[in-house]
Design a protein with these regions (language model features):
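Periplasmic N-terminal accessory/gating domains of Gram-negative outer-membrane beta-barrel systems
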Residues: 1-63, 74, 80
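Membrane-embedded beta-strand positions in outer-membrane beta-barrel channels/transporters
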Residues: 11, 55, 60, 72-76, ...
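Outer-envelope exported proteins of Gram-negative bacteria
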Residues: 15, 112, 155-161, 219-229, ...
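Short sequence motifs at beta-strands and strand-loop junctions characteristic
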Residues: 4-6, 67, 90-92, 132-136, ...
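Flexible loop and strand-edge segments within Gram-negative outer membrane beta-barrel domains
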Residues: 120, 153-154, 158-213, 228-252, ...
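Extracytoplasmic loops and strand-loop junctions of Gram-negative outer membrane beta-barrel proteins
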Residues: 37-41, 58-59, 80-83, 124-128, ...
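Short strand-turn segments of transmembrane beta-barrel domains in outer membranes
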Residues: 42-46, 54-64, 73-102, 110-115, ...
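Transmembrane beta-barrel wall of Gram-negative outer-membrane proteins
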Residues: 94-117, 130-170, 197-222
Length: 291
């Protein structure tokens, strides 16, 4: 079973596992997502650019040892190797993107470039918590390949991504109904906010691989990569709330208001989180096809 609990997120769980138990590879390089993200509204673009993808392999268990020791799943992405000049572009309310690919005259050098920009402000503004949402996310990816000879080639994969999220909440109105043989009521909570949240997530990735294919059956690949996450969260929000019975009789002038207060209070959400991760990896992979 593969599922997600939020339509705003690219996180997914497999067979009840956590999202961080899933491995993701792009052209044999392991990629990571921001670590401090706590909700879908903070997320930006996922690492994978669909316009650059050639093939996808997904294993929800029982995968080969070459993929490592994570518990739940493996998502193995292979990007395209262009054979001619081309490209694509798309524009939507939430996201815009441009992809360009091509080769040189002797077909030894190929490039695959992609740039995306996303803002889901229109979607977030329809949530229960009303306020000023300012999300933005952009990334640039490049895959460069050079064929030295029929047996040797080099590949460079790079990604630069930045996501910013600012929220100045104003008001939230929540309602739930309680039914029982002894008591039934419509309980509401009105929350008034002051303060703001400001987050930033910067991701940089650079991977280099040298590929040697001595024969049709044997393929050797040396890889080196660097992955960096620079994240910061700044939250200082005070909420004043009132809860009680909400009036849903449209004939009354108090329609939609709390008419029988049961309690009130104040809470504060405060955070100063910073995280910087730098991951270097050097590896070698070999593949021999007996067929």
């Amino acid at each position: 079973f593969v599922g997600s609990n939020n339509e705003l997120t690219s996180q997914y769980s497999v067979r009840g596992g956590s999202y961080d138990e899933n491995l993701i590879y792009v052209n044999d390089f392991e990629v990571f997502r921001p670590y401090l993200v706590r909700s879908g509204q903070q997320e930006g673009l996922s690492f994978i650019n669909p316009e650059m993808v050639k093939g996808i392999s997904f294993y929800n268990g029982g995968f080969q040892a070459k993929y490592g020791d994570k518990l739940s799943s493996v998502l193995d992405i292979q990007y395209k190797k262009p054979k001619k000049f081309g490209g694509s572009a798309y524009v939507s309310i939430l996201e815009q993107g441009l992809q360009v690919e091509g080769v040189n005259k002797n077909s030894k050098f190929s490039y695959l470039l992609g740039v995306r920009n996303r803002s889901n402000r229109n979607l977030l503004s329809r949530q229960d918590t009303k306020g000023n949402y300012v999300p933005s996310s952009a990334d640039f990816q490049a895959l460069l390949n050079y064929q030295f000879s029929p047996k040797w080639q080099a590949e460079l994969l790079s990604n630069i991504s930045q996501t910013k999220f600012t929220l100045i909440p104003e008001f939230s109105q929540l309602t739930t109904s309680v039914f029982s043989p002894l008591y039934s009521a419509t309980i509401g909570v009105d929350i008034y906010f002051e303060g703001r949240e400001k987050d930033r997530y910067q991701t940089n990735m650079l991977g280099f691989s040298l590929i040697n294919q001595p024969s049709k059956k044997l393929k050797l690949k040396w890889m080196a990569s660097r992955f960096e996450n620079d994240e910061a969260e700044n939250v200082d929000i005070i909420g004043t709330y009132l809860f009680g019975d909400r009036d849903f009789d449209k004939r009354n002038p108090t329609y939609g208001l709390i008419v029988n207060p049961l309690g009130a209070g104040v809470y504060q959400n405060w955070a100063r989180n910073e995280l910087n991760i730098e991951n270097w990896n050097v590896s070698h992979k070999g593949n021999y096809d007996k067929g």
